[in-house]
């Protein structure tokens, strides 16, 4: 689990194809300090497990499911990526709870200067636009591993926007991207849980109503 606060930008130094997916080696400084085999590091918002490390690099495997859902399918050697080590019980939670499980990609469709800030608009892939129901105005969304505040949404077209100040743009990879580029998106974890619970409760209620055993029935019969 992560906070969505990018610790540093690292650089991809090597990519190798494997039978199970990809092997990726990334250069970093902060995230490699005290790292151990088996530790989790978010790479552009994708939770990867460290399989090997050196003084300033770490290596991880990427499975096909992850490759298909994320921008790691387009990643190249020399590319800059956002990095964050997994949180601990003493980690300052300055962003929001991020799982490192990317839902889909989104395309940058516009970048407009707004005073000192820049307004970015994103459009979810059509087959994943149902995920916009978990993106709410003034809520949080994870973009390439960075926890950002949502300005507004357009559910019909799968579009949402965020506004970024210069400091943020200088410290995450989004500041280097342009219109037409794609980013990894992870939507709100709690929204997914609430939806699942409500669906389950509704299904259970329907079953009880069909059987004739409802809360009213139980109360009337002394239960």
Give residue spans per PLM region.
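Conserved loop->alpha-helix
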Residues: 1-223
């Amino acid at each position: 689990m992560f906070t969505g606060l990018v610790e540093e930008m690292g650089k991809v130094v090597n990519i190798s194809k494997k039978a199970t997916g990809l092997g990726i080696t990334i250069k970093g400084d902060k995230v490699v300090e005290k790292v151990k085999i088996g530790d989790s590091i978010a790479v552009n918002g994708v939770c990867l497990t460290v399989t090997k490390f050196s003084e300033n690099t770490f290596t991880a495997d990427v499975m096909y499911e992850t490759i298909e859902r994320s921008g790691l399918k387009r990643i190249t050697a020399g590319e800059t990526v956002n990095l964050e080590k997994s949180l601990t019980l003493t980690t300052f939670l300055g962003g929001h709870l991020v799982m490192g499980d990317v839902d889909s990609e989104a395309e940058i469709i516009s970048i407009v200067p707004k005073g000192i800030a820049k307004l970015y608009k994103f459009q979810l892939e059509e087959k994943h636009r149902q995920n916009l129901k978990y993106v709410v105005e003034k809520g949080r969304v994870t973009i390439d591993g960075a926890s950002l505040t949502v300005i507004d949404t357009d559910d019909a077209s799968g579009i949402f926007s965020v506004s970024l100040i210069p400091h943020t743009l200088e410290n995450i990879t989004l500041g280097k991207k342009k219109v037409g580029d794609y980013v990894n998106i992870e939507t709100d974890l709690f929204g997914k849980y609430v939806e699942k619970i409500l669906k389950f409760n509704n299904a259970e209620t329907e079953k009880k109503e069909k059987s004739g055993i409802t809360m009213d029935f139980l109360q009337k019969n002394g239960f």
